[in-house]
Amino acid sequence: MRLVVRALTVAAAAATALLIGTSGAQATANGSDPVFDNPPAGTATIGILATKLTHADATARLRSSGITWSSSGGCSNRNNATCTSFDQVNLTTIQGIQTLRSASGCAINVTGGTETGHASGTYSHWNGYKLDTSLSTCLNNYIQGNFSSIGGSKWESGAGNIYYKEGNHWDITYYNCGGC
């Protein structure tokens, strides 16, 4: 069933991308991501064009859901590793964090987006699939209490998105919007 849901989600994203004429051009950053270079087993993947957002569009969506963001450099330049940028983030990634906010009721602060400086890979920050968030007791309890532990410090949601607790933040990979 999850495979069918994922396939339908991917197909819907492809149709949306075609309808609004978004670009599928994706760049890569240096390095590799051995944990998240491939989706979990059973995740349907189809070569499609993801719907990309500008930084302004993404922040408007985050703001409307009560989600905050911050950066160590106080900036949003995608080419500066001390900034937090949402330029070229996938629409489904923003919808995924909005779904997490709504479902958990937790305050969420995003600390990493599509800016340079993260590991590369198909499902990377640079390519718009990943966000980092601050740790909080509320968010920790929600993720660890509602999602399936898949080893180490990783949890998988029912929708197949991956939540990886990396020391001082959550590194979240959104393959889809998580039931938006």
Language-model segment annotations:
Residues 110-121:
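Acidic helix-start/capping segments at beta-turn-to-alpha-helix junctions
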Residues 35-39, 48, 123-126:
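Surface-exposed flexible segments
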